[in-house]
Structures are given as C-alpha cells and as structure tokens.
From Swiss-Prot:
Biased composition (Polar residues): 361-378, 386-416
Positions annotated to bind ATP: 27-35, 52
Reaction(s) catalysed by this chain's protein: L-seryl-[protein] + ATP = O-phospho-L-seryl-[protein] + ADP + H(+); L-threonyl-[protein] + ATP = O-phospho-L-threonyl-[protein] + ADP + H(+); [DNA-directed RNA polymerase] + ATP = phospho-[DNA-directed RNA polymerase] + ADP + H(+)
Region of interest (Interaction with CCNC), ranges: 1-15
Descriptive protein name: Cyclin-dependent kinase 8
Bias-annotated ranges (Low complexity): 325-343
Taxonomy of the source species: Eukaryota, Metazoa, Chordata, Craniata, Vertebrata
Length: 416
C-alpha cells in the first residue's frame, strides 16, 4: 500500500476516543472485555450508547460471529449494532450499541432482595406478560431467520429505560449464536456444551446427541413468568422425588386450571418435539386476555429499578454474585462440562461466565431471511398501544414517573 495513502487513511479513520466520552463510565466487565456507557462528544444527540471493547487484540471467532449476525438482524426485540470501530494503534475492536438501562437478571434480583428484606415489591401481571411476549417475539424472529441464540438467560435479556424505546425488550449477546439449516444438528458439529448450566433444556442435561431450536426458545421462558423468583430454589434442588408441576404451583397460588398454568405446562414439556414453539406460545389464550401485552413493559407505571452503577478498575462487575459464580464453576469442574469465562449481555454481567471460542466452527450453509418484519406479517405479533407517555423529570432517587396516575409499585403485596 502506498505510504502516503496509508497515512491519509489513518488520519481520516474515525477513532472511538475522538467521538465518544466514556472514561470512568464502565458498567460491565468480563473475559469478553469491557462495556462503557458513552455519549457523543459533538452533542449531535443526547442518547446514551453502550461501547463494548473486545478483550485482547484482533477479532475472536465469537466477536466475528456476533458482528456478522447483528449486522443482518433487524428487529425491535433484538439488540441493534450501530457501528464497529477498529483501533489500528492497539488492535482493539469496539462495538457500539444502544444503551439499555436494565436487564432481566437485575430486575429479578431487585424483587428477590425486596422479598428478603420483608418489603416485597410485587410485579404487575401486565409487566410480566409484556416481558414474556416480547421475548417470544424476538426469539421467533431469530428462528424464522435460521438463527439459534444458544445462550438465552435473564442477563442476556435487556430492557430499555427512559427514552423513545422505553420498556422495550432487547435480546443480546450473539457470541454463541449459530446459523442452522437442518431440523437436527449433531452436537459434535458445534460446541460440546451450549447454554449456561442453570438454563439448559432437559434434553441437553439428559445427554441428547442432537438438538433443535427447542433448546433455545421455550425452556428458558419459565424465568420470565411471574413465579420464577420464588421457584428458583426449587429448580436447583438435586432431587426431584415425587416432583410434579402442580405441587410446586400450588404453593405459589397458581391454579391448575388457569391459562398461566396451561402455558407453563406447554413451555416446560420435557419432550422437545411436543414442546410448543415460540410462535405457538405467542398465540396462547394467556396473551389474549386482559391485561394485553404492550410494547412498553413499564406502561402506566414508574420504573423502580436503580440505574446501572459505574465500576472502578478493580471492582468486580457483580459483587453480590461471586458466590453463585464460584458454585457454578465448582459444579462445572465436577461434571466436566463447564466453560467459565465470557458472559456478555452487551451491558452488564450476570450469572456464570462463558469462554470465548477460538476454534472455528464447522462451516454451515444457509442464509438469513430479511425480507419482512415478523410483526407486520403476523397479526398475533401486534402489541397493545399503551398511548403516548409524557415523562416528568427524574426524582432524586433516579426513578421516573408518568404524568398520569398509574398503579404504583409499593412495599405492599397487591393483586394485578
């Protein structure tokens, strides 16, 4: 390459440090790298962005896969990759995303903590339903375009804060995602282990030699149902003697003849062939009764969840989850199936980490179908419009409220 042209090209290349202010605003850390909350220096807009710096030099296979998929995938419930920056000086890769203030892991953690403090904050049923519906919508879009996410868990389900996309769910972290072009895919052709341990579908735990997109779409949906926060300990028990869904649901006041119970039964079916798909789940009667799902999961309510805190250079991403991570790593070591390392939800750190793959996967063929938006083509994908939301200035606690008188979160247990 001509030297003068190379110098000119280097001078014209956009550098992330020239465009964004992010120093001291780290909100996430893992073996994948670091995530910063950033703003434009030129003041062209007031939006918050998430800058993800890939760890190491060059581009790993995981980063390549994530970039390639996110450049093609366009859906309201899938995280949007705005731009990729390559720093030739230090060979760093930066990914620019929309910033999501919350994620499902921290939402669940907030409610579990409030319950432990004897001041439970009840989730409105409408919020739970909207969360679940939007997650299913995003998963269906991925599967309709022949993409398996393979690492769905609460930490990878982002929720937008105040702004144009308030309350919008975003599925993040495509580092483990794969294209597929056949009903069954041998496990040996890809990774020996997929999906974080606690969120694996039963067929993976039982040693299935093949898996379908059923591992990706429905078993994890139990975590988005209202009963998840109280059921988490039950699902971690080592023994399931005389176990039945009805026995567990009874103590959480879920009636066996309710639409909620029937949907849970269909989502938790052990046989992946009989388990309902994300599209079928979206058409379930549960979503057709009031309150209807909305595009803003916080519609009519305040947002009680604290904003993301900035981390220091030495501070771990999630101090409260060290014990869980150590326990997870111990289980993985015992079973010989774990891969601690990179857990990337584009913004924040959740439960056990996963390792970045450095061995190229087996080549697969097949393309992405991007010709239509699922929401426009499927009448069941339409959300109820919650109406315009006029936000007031934030309070000193960092929460926001609507101008109307919505149902308030309180420290009392209410029925919604």
């Amino acid at each position: 390459m001509d030297y003068d042209f190379k110098v000119k090209l280097t001078g014209e290349r956009e550098r992330v440090e020239d465009l964004f202010e992010y120093e001291g605003c780290k909100v996430g850390r893992g073996t994948y790298g670091h995530v910063y909350k950033a703003k434009r220096k030129d003041g062209k807009d007031d939006r918050d962005y998430a800058l993800k710096q890939i760890e190491g030099t060059g581009i790993s296979m995981s980063a390549c896969r994530e970039i390639a998929l996110l450049r093609e995938l366009k859906h309201p419930n899938v995280i949007s990759l705005q731009k990729v920056f390559l720093s030739h000086a230090d060979r760093k890769v930066w990914l620019l995303f929309d910033f999501a203030e919350h994620d499902l892991w921290h939402i669940i953690k907030f409610h579990r903590a409030s319950k432990a403090n004897k001041k439970p904050v009840q989730l409105p049923r409408g919020m739970v339903k909207s969360l679940l519906y939007q997650i299913l919508d995003g998963i269906h879009y991925l599967h309709a375009n022949w993409v398996l996410h393979r690492d769905l868990k609460p930490a990878n389900i982002l929720v937008m804060g105040e702004g144009p996309e308030r309350g919008r769910v975003k599925i993040a972290d495509m580092g483990f995602a794969r294209l597929f072009n056949s009903p069954l895919k041998p496990l040996a052709d890809l990774d020996p282990v997929v999906v974080t341990f606690w969120y694996r579908a039963p067929e993976l735990l039982l040693g299935a030699r093949h898996y379908t997109k059923a591992i990706d779409k429905d078993w994890e949906d139990i975590k988005k149902m209202p009963e998840h926060s109280t059921l988490i300990k039950d699902f971690r028990r080592n023994t399931y003697t005389n176990c039945s869904l009805i026995k567990y649901m009874e103590k959480h006041k879920v009636k066996p003849d309710s639409k909620t119970f029937h949907l849970l039964q269909k989502l938790l079916t052990m046989d992946p062939i009989k388990r309902i798909s994300s599209e079928q789940a979206m058409q379930d009667p549960y979503f057709l009764e009031d309150p209807l799902p909305t595009s803003d999961v916080f519609a009519g309510c305040q947002i009680p969840y604290p904003k993301r805190e900035f981390l220091t250079e030495e501070e771990p991403d999630d101090k409260g989850d060290k014990k869980n991570q150590q326990q997870q790593q111990g289980n993985n070591h015992t079973n010989g199936t774990g891969h601690p390392g990179n857990q990337d939800n584009s913004h924040a750190q959740g439960p056990p980490l996963k390792k970045v793959r450095v061995v190229p996967p087996t080549t697969t063929s097949g393309g992405l179908i991007m010709t239509s938006d699922y929401q426009r083509s499927n009448p069941h994908a339409a959300y109820q419009n919650p109406g315009p939301s006029t936000s007031q200035p934030q309070s000193s606690m960092g929460y926001t409220s609507t101008s109307q008188q919505p149902p308030q979160y309180s420290h009392q247990t209410h029925r919604y």
